[in-house]
Amino acid sequence: EQNMIQRLILTLVAVCFSFSVFAQDPIRVVGSSTVYPFTTNVAEKFGKLFGSTPIVESTGTGGGMKLFCAGATIETPSVTGASRAIKSKEAKMCADNGVSYIEVMIGNDGIAFANSLSGPQLNLTKKQLWLAMAELGPKPSKWSEIDPSLPDMEISILSPPPTSGTRDAWNSLVMKKGCPKDILESQGKKKCYQLREDGAVTEVGENDALIIQKLQDNEVRFGIFGFSYLDNAGDKIKPMTIEGVEITLDTIQSYEYPIARPLFVYFKKEHFEYVPGLKDFVKFYVSDSIMGPEGALMDIGLVPLDPATFKDMVASIQ
């Protein structure tokens, strides 16, 4: 009997040892601060089911792409989140470094322009937002200088940094659309994107939660961030109406809200062979219970894809 127990102990030791040799580091995820709360939620649920919780870092979309496309070795991240589609120069960097990927559109998001509950409620146009924020604009010090119907209140706006996908989306959906045609044609879109440097607009790091915190005690300040952060802090701040449309789940999904955009997650194909659990993580992420119309991510503010788009997207990656 003692022999049997010893043999059993040796077998267990051998099994544990073989597992520790093959046990890799957890799946590593980087990228967008907007996508971060969604992927963190998925990672925690995945960890409970599969025993290994992916490590998720918020680096911003641009920073995430740099890390993700740097190479296919085990030290590089397996996954990156993006609050805009991959740019052609990033796709080239990936290709040059031997990285191929699966692109998953996980849902939709609206970019909120919001202030504290004690601040005014405004209906703003893209043109007015451009005039308030642009380096090439008239640089008004008060909102009333843009339009007499707007409050006699100093302009103070917190913006995401240039590395942020939210900033990229804001540029293409607001700054480009609000920029006067003659400036756009004579100087190009990059000039239209330039923000004032006189203190009216302040860049805040890759941290949407920090922007919200800075709004709460300041009734003249506005901030720019993703809908999920608004959804989770709705009792502390309120969004402005843009071009007459309120930001809601429905207006984002229908793209009626003028600053709506898709969100993405990219998975590194080269890692499927040697990062344990990565294939399962992809399947789990796109499952009905996570990303579907009634999925877990909807509960924390992700605007789901419409059912037909969701079905096509899942079919395309099988």
Model features per residue range: what roles?
Residues 1-3:
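Short, Lys/Arg-enriched N-terminal segments with co-localized hydrophobic residues
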Residues 5-14:
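Sec-dependent signal peptide recognition
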Residues 23-318:
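Flexible loop/hinge segments at secondary-structure junctions
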